[in-house]
Design a protein with these regions (language model features):
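Disordered, acidic Ser/Thr/Pro-rich linker "stalks" and the adjacent N-terminal cap
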Residues: 18-120, 131-136, 165-173, 179, ...
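Acidic, glycine-anchored loop motifs typical of Ca2+
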Residues: 89-98, 244-255, 570, 601, ...
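A short beta-strand element within beta-rich, extracytoplasmic domains
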Residues: 121-133, 200, 280-293, 405-418, ...
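Exposed low-complexity, polar/acidic, P/S/T/G-rich flexible segments that act as propeptides
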Residues: 123, 206-227, 368-397, 407-413, ...
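Short coil-to-beta strand junction motifs in C2/discoidin
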Residues: 133-141, 294-303, 420-424, 624-628, ...
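Low-complexity, intrinsically disordered segments enriched in Ser/Thr together with acidic residues
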Residues: 664-695
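Short loop/turn motifs at secondary-structure boundaries
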Residues: 676, 723-835
Length: 835
């Protein structure tokens, strides 16, 4: 009940009287940083949704979105025809009610269709859909190409393979070419056929033909393609080259792989690939069969590992780390390819989808033969990854949020949808200092230096943006994840600047969370640089101890506090306190800040010692503060005998109000406190039970606007009390049974037994039991049985057995038992019953 009350009073401000900073619009969300490439969708009404990876897609539909460089020029995917080009786009628009038809007056040699998918795909089937109400094309041939040159000296001519030809006049509206019989060199089935180009040649004219759609059905979206667009990356050893080319969608580029056998680590034949986000993956494949060469391109073996980023205690070597972290790797492929003929295409399928973000590849087994390899090793020409479902983990980070002035941020809330198996996790960090940076972009959106920008022609110069960035050493670490909407703000406050990080995660591929808004509640700050400490710093568990909590303010260099009347005129503190509330104006913290040229705050003396060219700006800031006249202390048990001092002077008990609950102590002070001279000392007695007991402290000058007071940074763990004896020793302490002899005859004298004890070193709920036995060990009665934790217990026994009957006179054994977090403990005493 006490804990609930603490949370309730600390959350009061989010209900009324607070200012709010709300993030809820499409424009606001689009200023956040998050993986691109369809991983996150921001809707027009301001919802943040997680992207979905599709299965069995038609690769023709988005062909025009892909482009590549070929023979020195940029080429876009799309469709070309030999006749009536004005309606050619209808062939790949996904609409079967539109169609393309060649001009009947054109020669038959112009009746053809060329489709360039813009990237290499794995085709499961090609489907031609002819227009309804028109005559299907009766005779035609279908060719496909991986976009490889047929002749070295004639680079514009591609190598095509005939995959289908009508052997009798076609009369069907749909014609399909299936690639489900594709196999590798050893007869193992493959997922489909690699191709980029489709050519359809019509061999017979009809009067009213119409081709509505050409579809190329693939296993799904190729997750690998947008690695770099999402912010992913790949690092690799020096004897693998240009690994980023294995996921560029082009079969004629790739990575060479030195055949190092088991010595892959020392010879640097590895790559560590970050997809930029986590995905549900059910298959991946790669090919060593690319452009024609005079030497072999196969790998003699390899191993592949995957990870979702789960942290591990250590890594076998630094190359396994991702962003400096050790992660858990799972081996999903171990292939010895020293076979004849060597395999060139590899499909890896999973019985159940796996959460994958990181892929680690290294060569293994053979070392090759230089005469057939030209010292080049093997090749990976293209690597594809497939899956289905919502992206299981997406992280978004806010731009720097500027509240305009120092504020007391009290709580954070959010609105979203979390189906079962999904989570919205939010954390924050705050800071005192930022630097303004200028960023330069060209018209294409590429960032560059100021010098590069100024060298560009005017027509190629893009926007110049000014933005604020944190100066890291003045910023806090990320807070713990907030437990739910309305949680107390966990980062240092008051603050002017903050960052928010959101993680949208799911344990299932068929559901995902979505986020509508985040709201910060804040008010005027009580003041800056408040800190708290508690004394003594050590105590005994389960026994009353006298504690003193001190709250004080420290002034910054160059800081002054000024008082004003309601007309803005500066007055003295003494005069301000004598004014009626309606006439009082603001109390203001005025500060002067000195910076070096890099934006780091320095002292005035350091600034004056710098050469003028190395000096940064001098800034003057003013922040209105409320001061505080309420203090709340979270206590391990009910506080007693409370005393108060302000500025070292005792405050009479009738001059302040005390409210005591089981785990909180609240005081209403006789005046508002602003300055270091008015340090506040609260003395009280209470009983600690847990080692590392934290005395959290809050102050307020506005009803409900509680501001957390951090521990004094000068002293380590300044508000934490240690109980050294709890590091060892029994769970049950201070067991007392009184009286040792009872006479339960109803005369009101020694009629019942009082059993008191302290439970220590138990943090979770555990069974606490008190049981009575006779001298023969037979159970007489279980007097107490309940889930409990560390604390003082007092149990009574009136001398009756489990049936409610009076026990006969004699000696009995009283046993106290506690099932601890890691062990159990028992303690017992004898008692005597007489009549």
């Amino acid at each position: 009940m006490g804990t609930y009350f603490l949370l309730l009073i600390l959350s009061t401000l989010s209900g009324a009287g607070a200012e709010r900073y709300v993030i809820s619009t499409e424009e606001q969300w689009k200023q956040w940083s998050y993986p691109s490439g369809g991983i996150v969708e921001i809707t027009p009404d301001g919802w943040v949704k997680v992207g979905y990876i599709r299965k069995d897609i038609n690769a023709c539909l988005d062909a025009p979105k892909f482009s590549y460089k070929w023979l020195g020029r940029k080429v876009k995917g799309g469709v070309k025809v030999g006749s009536n080009s004005g309606t050619s786009k209808n062939i790949i628009d996904g609409d079967t009610t539109t169609y393309w038809a060649p001009n009947p007056e054109d020669d038959l040699k112009d009746w053809w269709v060329d489709i360039d998918l813009g990237r290499l795909v794995t085709a499961k089937k090609i489907r031609l859909i002819f227009a309804g109400g028109r005559t299907p094309f009766p005779e035609f041939r279908i060719y496909v190409s991986k976009h490889l040159q047929k002749y070295a000296k004639l680079p514009k001519i591609l190598e095509y393979d005939l995959v289908a030809k009508t052997v009798k006049p076609n009369t069907e509206r749909t014609f399909e070419v299936n690639f489900d019989s594709e196999k590798d060199r050893h007869g193992n089935p493959l997922m489909g056929r690699y191709l980029q180009n489709i050519r359809i040649v019509f061999d017979k004219k009809v009067e009213d033909p119409g081709l509505a759609e050409v579809e190329v059905i693939t296993p799904g979206e190729n997750i690998a393609l947008k690695t770099l667009e999402r912010g992913g990356k790949v690092k690799y050893g020096g004897r693998m080259t240009k690994v980023e080319q294995i996921f560029d969608g082009l079969i004629w580029t790739g990575s060479t792989v030195t055949l190092a056998g088991a010595d892959w680590l020392r010879q640097h034949v590895w790559c560590n690939w970050d997809l930029g986000a986590t995905f549900w993956v059910d298959a991946m494949r790669f090919t060593s069969e690319g452009r024609h060469m005079r030497w072999r391109s196969d790998l003699e073996g390899f191993r592949i590992y995957v990870s979702d980023g789960t942290e591990a205690p250590t890594s076998p070597a630094d190359v396994w780390k991702v962003d400096g972290k050790d992660v858990v790797w799972e081996r999903i492929a171990d292939v010895d390819n020293k076979v004849s003929p060597p395999r060139l295409n590899f499909d890896i399928k999973f019985p159940k989808p796996k959460r994958i973000r990181y892929i680690f590849f290294h060569h293994y087994y053979g070392t090759g033969y230089w005469a057939t390899r030209a010292s080049a090793g093997g090749y990976i020409w293209e690597f594809q990854i497939f899956g289905e479902g919502f992206v299981p983990g997406v992280t978004l980070r806010s731009p720097l949020i500027d509240l305009g002035k120092m504020n007391n941020i009290t709580s954070i809330s959010w609105e979203g949808i979390t189906p079962p198996g999904t989570k919205i996790e939010i954390r924050t960090r705050t800071g005192e200092r930022v630097r303004e940076v200028t960023r330069y972009f060209d018209k294409a959106g590429n960032e560059m230096t100021k010098e590069q920008y100024e060298r560009l022609p005017k027509f190629r110069q893009g926007p110049i943006k000014k933005e604020k960035q944190p100066i890291e050493k003045y910023w806090s670490k990320w807070s713990p994840v907030y437990k739910g909407p309305g949680a107390r703000f966990a980062s240092p406050s008051p603050s002017r600047y903050l960052l928010i990080e959101v993680n949208l995660s799911s344990e299932r591929p068929d559901v995902a969370p979505s986020l509508k808004s985040i709201t910060l509640f804040y008010s005027k700050a009580v003041g800056s640089r408040l800190s708290a400490e508690v004394n003594p710093r050590t105590a005994e568990p389960g026994r009353p101890e006298r504690f003193k909590v001190v709250v004080r303010k420290r002034m910054y260099e160059g800081e002054v506090i000024s008082w004003h009347d309601k007309w803005g005129r500066k007055i003295t503190e003494e005069r301000w306190r004598k004014l009626p509330s309606a006439i009082r104006g603001p109390v203001v913290e005025e500060r002067t800040h000195w910076y070096d040229e890099e934006g780091n705050e320095i002292t005035k003396e350091e600034w004056e010692e710098l050469k003028p060219g190395k000096r940064g700006k001098v800034e003057h800031t003013k922040d209105e503060i409320t001061g505080f006249n309420r203090i709340l202390i979270k206590t391990p048990s009910k506080a007693e005998d409370v005393k108060l001092r302000i500025g070292g002077r005792p405050v009479p008990p009738d001059s302040f109000v005390v409210e005591v609950r089981e785990d909180t102590l609240t005081l209403d002070l006789p005046k508002l406190v602003f300055t270091p001279e008015d340090s506040v000392e609260v003395e009280f007695s209470c009983v600690p039970y847990f080692n590392g007991t934290l005395f959290e402290v809050f102050v307020a000058g506005i009803p409900g606007a509680w501001q957390m007071v951090p521990p004094d940074p000068v002293r380590k763990n300044a508000t934490t009390v240690m109980l050294p004896s709890l590091t060892k020793g029994p769970l049950i302490r201070n067991l007392k049974i009184t009286p040792r002899v009872i006479t339960p005859n109803g005369d009101g004298y020694n009629d019942e037994l009082s059993i008191s004890f302290t439970v220590s070193r138990v943090e979770g709920l555990r069974w606490v039991k008190v049981t009575l036995y006779n001298v023969e060990g037979r159970l007489i009665r279980e007097v107490y049985r309940s889930l409990g934790t560390s604390g003082n217990y007092k149990i009574r026994w009136e001398g009756k057995d489990g049936s409610g009957d009076a026990v006969p006179p004699g000696v009995y054994l009283c046993e106290v038992r506690v099932d601890g977090d890691a062990t159990e403990d028992r303690a017992n005493r004898t008692v005597v019953v007489v009549y």
